[in-house]
Amino acid sequence: MSKKIAVLITDEFEDSEFTSPADEFRKAGHEVITIEKQAGKTVKGKKGEASVTIDKSIDEVTPAEFDALLLPGGHSPDYLRGDNRFVTFTRDFVNSGKPVFAICHGPQLLISADVIRGRKLTAVKPIIIDVKNAGAEFYDQEVVVDKDQLVTSRTPDDLPAFNREALRLLGA
């Protein structure tokens, strides 16, 4: 069954951490909807390898419209967490119990949303202390799945495992 996957993304996202999962989700028949401050805007990856035209504005969506949430890394999550609309969307999504996929710096939005206390996850090395300070149990491994809801990975090298577990939770 086709699922709708929300992606919170803005400029300087880690190119492959969006393109790889998005391609795999689409191949499995799922719909990927990109969300930023402004619909129709084009955002660029930090390596300049990918650009994405935003489908929806954060003001026109709610977590109830989606089946899963993807939080790619790079600088994008840090930029987005400065806007409470994205933090609230993330918090409400996690609290809904639906799958959330966060890689590299993606957990920065989870930290700002205060939803990882007592959860198991991994992330890129520079934010390990932030993950621990937010009350999560950190695991240095390619993919961590917590409560069959939260899938996290560290870097683009972990994308095969990240994509595999995300697709498993989507039922694909």
From Swiss-Prot:
The protein's Enzyme Commission number? 3.1.2.-, 3.5.1.-, 3.5.1.124
User: What phenotype has been reported when the gene encoding this protein is knocked out?
Assistant: Cells lacking this gene are highly sensitive to oxidative, thermal, UV, and pH stresses, but only slightly sensitive to salt stress and insensitive to cold stress. They display increased protein glycation levels, and decreased viability in methylglyoxal- or glucose-containing media. They also show highly increased DNA and RNA glycation levels, and exhibit strong mutator phenotypes.
Gene Ontology BP, a term: response to pH
Q: Where in the cell is it found?
A: Cytoplasm
Q: Does the keyword Ribonucleoprotein apply?
A: no
Annotated active site: C104
GO MF annotations for this entry? glyoxalase III activity; identical protein binding; protein deglycase activity
Q: Which InterPro entries match?
A: C56_PfpI-like, Class_I_gatase-like, DJ-1/PfpI
What family does the Swiss-Prot or TrEMBL record give for this protein? Belongs to the peptidase C56 family.
**Under which name does UniProt file this protein?**
Protein/nucleic acid deglycase 2
Biological source species: Escherichia coli (strain K12)
Give the gene symbol: yhbO
